[in-house]
Amino acid sequence: MSRVAKAPVNIPAGIEVKINGQLLTVKGKNGELSREIHNAVEVNQDANALTFVPREGVANADAQAGTARALVNAMVIGVTEGFTKKLQLVGVGYRAQMKGNVVALSLGYSHPIEHTLPLGVTGECPSQTEIILKSADKQLIGQVAADIRAYRRPEPYKGKGVRYSDEVVRTKEAKKK
């Protein structure tokens, strides 16, 4: 059995968990998230904990149990606390601003870039060079942050571009004559 799957997922007070076949739904103050659990994993609900047991005779059931436990744990954290991603814009003239649920980016191209945030993700720009994204869905917020970063990834010589706030950009030395 996977080491990750051995640990149960604790359900805090105020969180409602429903298991309908292989569909698991977690409801909390930040919203509701649902996920289809792999058939190789059996989910058991106790009073305030979820346990994940791999089914016998199914290939990679141990790995699937660990994966399911990690994903459900992220769902529980998401509906209780939520997740945030911070992006920084580094470069002369690089700007960001929110227009409703659209992030308007000026990244040195001849045209402005407008990225519409999907349902479940909110954003704010405390300054022109900073974007803060918030969501209950860890995978969705990570994908949205990666999509915004992909418009202008940090380049290795000056470090200009869109980067995560905790990202360390390794810079190269310029070519010498």
Swiss-Prot record:
Q: Name one GO biological process term.
A: cytoplasmic translation
Q: Which residues form the signal peptide?
A: none
GO MF annotations in UniProt: rRNA binding; structural constituent of ribosome
Gene3D superfamilies from the UniProt entry: Ribosomal protein L6, alpha-beta domain
Kindly state which keywords UniProt assigns to this record, in alphabetical order.
Ribonucleoprotein, Ribosomal protein, RNA-binding, rRNA-binding
Q: List the disulfide bonds.
A: none
Top-level taxon: Bacteria
Has keyword Ion transport?
no
Task: Share what the entry says about its subunit structure, partners included.
Answer: Part of the 50S ribosomal subunit.
Per the record, the similarity remark reads:
Belongs to the universal ribosomal protein uL6 family.
Kindly provide the name given to this protein in its UniProt entry. Large ribosomal subunit protein uL6
Per the UniProt record, the source organism is: Haemophilus ducreyi (strain 35000HP / ATCC 700724)
